[in-house]
């Protein structure tokens, strides 16, 4: 697996999609050959067999779609495996989505130090929220504690944030590894996982968004979006949902998305 030419390594975390993937876009913009990696279980996550299977299936679909471009997706067991992989791939830069939890931030600081010692840059992109978490601060430079004030600042800052198409090159000369078999518990699925299923669910939900201000109060009738699991895994871009909601004046649903950014 030792690579002679320089590569960029995209580390998938909670952005298991191709469409509107800022980390992938940054990798494409670098002009270097792209290799990808997914860590099968993050240290910041409590063991949840159903969630683990959902993420595994999303990564499996991602592996198949990347393979169509001859872009390999490696699977490693822990964050500590990232540096040896990056070194073997001759990766000059590792690009991943921005960390949000305290455990992730601590681990990223640790990884940044190790990567820096090895001469490898660790770069972050915003793929979890609509807006990156840092730009919105109050007049005192502190995070907002009032949602109404946050929403006004969010709407003012949003104008430049739009989903983007990720135009992946078809690479030559890269071997695509097999995706490993799932070793955890296999449980009945409440929802099909992956980007394709996420987009299908979104298209079905938005057909009835005009009625959402009323139907949102009747969750027993399946009038909610059923997108939470997909958003959590990053199978669908929140920027896409916000752009389409705003364009079609679905403001009640947009408020839910803004509140999601606020909670991050």
Language-model features: locations:
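Trp/Phe/Arg-rich N-terminal binding region typifying the photolyase-homology
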Residues: 1-162, 249
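Glycine/tryptophan-enriched, flexible segments
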Residues: 120, 141-264
